[in-house]
Amino acid sequence: RLTTNLRIGLEGHEARARTRLTEGDKVFVALSWSKHPAPQNFEEAADKMWKTSESWRQWINIGDFPDHPWRAYLQRSALTLKGLVYSPTGALLAASSTSLPETPQGERNWDYRYSWIRDSTFALWGLYTLGLDREADDFFSFIADVSGATNGERHPLQVMYGVGGEQIGRAHV
């Protein structure tokens, strides 16, 4: 859902807006897909943006980052991994992209919007070693759910799952 106080024009698959701002003008554009209501004005948009930013700052401050010249890079990497976590289930997406070829112009395309068990484990181990263990705990719950451990029916783990725990056949890879 696209919400704004600008006049939007739709051109094919694109939404465009033009305006000339003068000092004191306030505009906002919000793109959302949440069940929560989108902001309806500049003040609501600014408040939501501030709260989101503050939430991310609080999360990164939980971590135990070494006093190292690369500390900022470790923090940025941790934030990137956190952004790939699907919080309703604890699944970690391999990436936020889809259909990237294994080689340029190649036929083998991989969809990285799934949770690949091996890759997720390595990534979450990184967060765990930085003291950000909640995400690892949530992922273990995700694994327990998809393996049937929570209802007593154990299933062998697949290579990957949908972020909601959906079983993915090889045709989707």
PLM region descriptions:
Residues R1-H172:
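Acidic, mature catalytic/reactive cores of soluble proteins
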